[in-house]
């Protein structure tokens, strides 16, 4: 319908006005143009192919002639689609155009019916209607220009208002806009959106899959025909058409048919109509390229045979004809048409069908059906003419050939569509199987039964069996092997040299799943060896499991006869076809065999069946493997639980140690030097280290603040110490130093004012636990060796392990200092408070309970003696009821709430992970940005996390800020641990370690220490002391140690080898500074310049400056040459000493000690000249030493100092 109207205001109609001599104007039936004049509104609508109710039907072309005031005619033409059938033109092109007013309009509206001269609406005459149209047209012509201008001004004004006040426009839309305007606006918006091209194929496929099987067997055309008229009427209608029209009509009938059954039925019926054949059959090609055969899709179909009957007959008795057998078989093999006039005279004709049905076959026309590539996809056969002719003539052959050409395209399309439907259903089944794998992963029997049921229903077989192989992968040890080496298969490949019997013994079946008919339940059994050996089906499955090959058997008896390995004793007469396929796991190891027995229709299993069954086998393997892995994982989890229980027992400190520590006197913090940044643990024994930790907790008021039971705290400290390995550096002593530095930063550095008590508790715990169970190797080594820790934690490997060990200790019985709820208060707990001496444990809550108990006793029994033993026994009794006493005295154990527990554990985890230098580099820039912006409020969660992370790193590397006598010893320990890792990398990984871990480059340690200080330590301490000036000693100590390391690095560069053994000995400065100590265990190798010449011409060179003397300087460096900077520095030193200036103290002391030591041990005469001073003595002594080759006492540890003078 086309509505033509104009807006109020007199806009001209956009309908084209043409004169009678001009070409007719056409307007599409889908266009919509409004046309109004004042209060009147006229609608012009056109409909094609029918008459509206109440209208008078008209004839003609369907145009609407209407005269205007100027004598023009309004002509609206429309186009409609012609009908598929060849109807007369007058019938197919009938149309009408009507002008009507919408409901509710005034009486001025009119309705016109076409053609001209027909009766008009009952309310108006034709002349009145024509006058109305002329009036509207003239008014539109006069007001077109003014209306257009006013409309544009209105648009501009409204647009300006909307732009200035969009809120008002939105409010008007939501509150006062007419519904019609909103619907038009919504329609306009929808039309502006980009639309996807409609997929006809997808819609058709979805409609097909949603339809019922009954509807799918019938095409839409057949449904409409069956409802409209009977078959004889359709036949009479087709007979009225000429041959060309009939041929095209029949082609259109099969062109869009996608159901293969309906298509074949239509082909046979239509061929009967075209050739006047009595009945026909259609065969489709099946089978493999080497074994092809024809299957009768529909057989003996007449023009009166219904589709349902034809399909039922073909399904009940399936006819299979091999290529080359019979008339149809010869046509399929030769691709040549066969036209037989007398069937019984042809030797290829099989008269058995005629004998069964009583029908006599005379003439036969059989023709191949090929696809676009020329391959045979079917054979069509028609028999006996119905028009009195006794044979099929050339005209019938030509029509048959032409029609089958189009039918070949339709058949192939239908087959492709059928394959798509089958693939779709197959995918749905496989998705259901995948879903079942996750649903039934804890029940292997249910999973296998569900898979077998789906396979049996899809492949239409009689029986289905699954044999499971007894493998090592069924044991938990297999999963452990996979975890140890995830990139290597844990299964052992079968060697080709193994015999069949040896392979067979390794693949022994342990479980058998059997599923019979449709209504039979699954049977699960564990067959014995004798049962397996006597069963042919089990032997075939054993053959498949051993060889790993898929077996598709058409004749079981013949196959068993051809394979001598099968020695079965049971009867196999009922077994016709077997499809047997191996089931493999993720490691490509056969874990079972799936077996299908006998298709329901008696035919062998095809390649398509094997392909579908392969998918079932894959999903079955995944499900079985997944279920077995789940069972193994459960076993391993149980093992892990037992191992953790054992580990927790052995990792926890003993009760004797705990009781001893609880009874020990805890000295004051000053006696341990805990407040100082120069703290050292060298003088502390192991028990003192634990006491120092307890004192730090007490001084931070954590014991009383969180009411930590004292025996729990002591046991936890001892357990933490016990879980550190005896490595050279990352041991319990290192954890103690880190915790002490944190304590000093909190107390001396006044950082506690930025932290809550809960955060202080978390930081101290994190410091003590940050290297738990350290193995002396870093994260990179764990990743390179693919250790279980690297598999468990992909990032910050060791740090995550340290935190997990911390949690393990806390979760151990009697070690949870973060325990929630009321803490357990026993007699042992409070008894530990007695005898601590001097009130050193004043923060211990047990003392409060004991005081309450004693006051209560003497209040009620004042005559008791305070020293009486009765008092002690009564006190012990009161302690047993301490909970009641605490309630009465309002002293409840305020242990951590669940929220506080989560908070402190989060602090501990974040702090321990922050000790990874990779995390430090990630957080450093954000922290520097906050400091540079002058941040002073550190109470935000993110800012507090950054601050705690920087403090943990500062404490972790705080050994670099210790006094020099402490720092260089710690550096030796770190270097030794690194060198051990480097040795492991050479031994296990066969790789060259980095310089800091290479024992052969240990001389570079001072230089590497300087680099470590410059890159990590100094920037960190600088920014911390700039923000928190109370921790400046860390920065100053680091600067001092950097100067020492730099000085030592320069001397090593000059040729001083300060390391000569696997363990690092004292540096040069330590000996140089000890002027009063006698040096006994150092071997000196002194090289002078031209010693022989000097002994002969001493007077000659006595006045020559050292730096101008000829000769080469011999260095003890490996390269044998000194750098330019070293030569310059050495020359200046020697020149200044010869000029009488005071040399450096270290060199002077060194020279004196060397000369005295060499003089005492040298066999030279005492009358040797001494005028040359210390240098002369050094030269003489050195030459004598070199000549004599004397050695220092071998029983002492020896180090080598090479001094170049």
UniProtKB/Swiss-Prot annotation:
Ranges of Basic and acidic residues composition bias in the record: 1098-1109, 1152-1162
Region (Disordered): 1-153, 1093-1122, 1152-1205
Disulfides per UniProt: none
Classification via Pfam families: GAF (PF01590), PDEase_I (PF00233)
Cofactor names: a divalent metal cation
Keyword annotations from UniProtKB, A to Z: Cell membrane, cGMP, Hydrolase, Lipoprotein, Membrane, Metal-binding, Methylation, Prenylation, Repeat
Enzyme class at the top of the EC tree: hydrolase
Binding site for a divalent metal cation 2: 771
Propeptide residues according to the Swiss-Prot or TrEMBL record: 1203-1205
Matches recorded under SMART domains: GAF (SM00065), HDc (SM00471)
Compartments, as annotated in UniProt: Cell membrane
Biased composition regions of type Polar residues, renumbered to the chain: 33-48, 83-94
Lipidated residue numbers (S-farnesyl cysteine): 1202
Binding site residues for a divalent metal cation 1: 734, 770-771, 956
Record-annotated PDEase domain positions: 654-1052
A GO CC annotation given for this chain: membrane
PROSITE patterns (UniProt xref): PDEASE_I_1 (PS00126), PDEASE_I_2 (PS51845)
A single GO BP: signal transduction
Comp. bias (Basic residues): 1195-1205
Gene3D superfamilies: 3'5'-cyclic nucleotide phosphodiesterase, catalytic domain, 3.30.450.40
Low complexity bias spans: 18-32, 62-71, 118-140, 1171-1191
Family note: Belongs to the cyclic nucleotide phosphodiesterase family.
Assembly, per entry: Interacts with PrBP.
Protein name according to UniProt: cGMP-specific 3',5'-cyclic phosphodiesterase
Organism of provenance: Drosophila sechellia
